[in-house]
Amino acid sequence: MSVVSLLGVKIVNNPAPFLAPYQFEITFECLEQLQKDLEWKLTYVGSATSSEYDQELDSLLVGPIPVGVNKFLFEADAPDLKRIPTSEILGVTVILLTCSYDGREFVRVGYYVNNEYDSEELTQDPPAKPIIERIRRNILAEKPRVTRFAIKWDSEEDAPAEYPPDQPEADLEDDGAAYGAEEAELEAALIRELEEAEREAAKGGDHEMEGAEETAGKDDEEEDLSDAESEDIEDESDDEEDDLDEDEGGDRDEDVEMGDDTESKDTNAASGHHQQQDIMVH
């Protein structure tokens, strides 16, 4: 909680000529006795494009500060024209009223200021060189922008927390190492799944090759057997050769067809037994 609270700011002379001093009636409340003075400052923003042209118009030390509500008049000089770009004199700019304690700013009030000529004729057709005596400033007092900052006052107890509270258990763990371990574990699990899938695929291919070899072996044996029978039959009788050859030829054709069916069934069975698993990557 802030020891000093700004209650109100009243601009005494507004609108006013450009070269007239600024006058503020400031009201604030102090909740406890302070050891040091309050420092008030007024800054004129000379250009919206660079802080190089900012001017501190005046500063004022107020103290000792009694506990309770306090009021005082803060007066500051007009800005130095030599430090303002000619093109930035007319138009809208900003003034900043700030207060600090022991070098630490705790409140800032910003006002828009419109600088314009006091006649419609000059406003419509401004001269190349500004006529300062004809320029008037108008502070938009109804729309200030107030920013407050938590600071350390006289006691360490009221100092704001600069760092998050200690968390001994959390501090003992290395977040970077833990994150790296999780990544390594996930990568290892993924590699294991891929290797297992490859082994399953290779194993399925072996089954298919074995089935094909067995079928081919059976076909060879049947063909050899058919050839042997044909040779024996040729030795026994020439008259029966044609008929037996036709019969054996028909049997061989049937055996080949059966062999094709068997091979197809074996291949289909092997393909049905082996199905590649879908790998879900998380």
Swiss-Prot record:
It is found in: Nucleus. GO terms for biological process: cellular response to stress; DNA replication-dependent chromatin assembly; nucleosome assembly; nucleosome disassembly; positive regulation of transcription elongation by RNA polymerase II; protein modification process; silent mating-type cassette heterochromatin formation; subtelomeric heterochromatin formation. InterPro entries: ASF1-like (IPR006818), ASF1-like_sf (IPR036747), Hist_deposition_Asf1 (IPR017282). GO terms for molecular function: acetyltransferase activator activity; histone binding. Keywords: Chaperone, Chromatin regulator, Coiled coil, Nucleus, Transcription, Transcription regulation. Its main location: nucleus. Interacts with histone H3 and histone H4. Histone chaperone that facilitates histone deposition and histone exchange and removal during nucleosome assembly and disassembly. This is Histone chaperone asf1. It comes from Aspergillus fumigatus (strain ATCC MYA-4609 / CBS 101355 / FGSC A1100 / Af293) (Neosartorya fumigata). The gene is asf1.
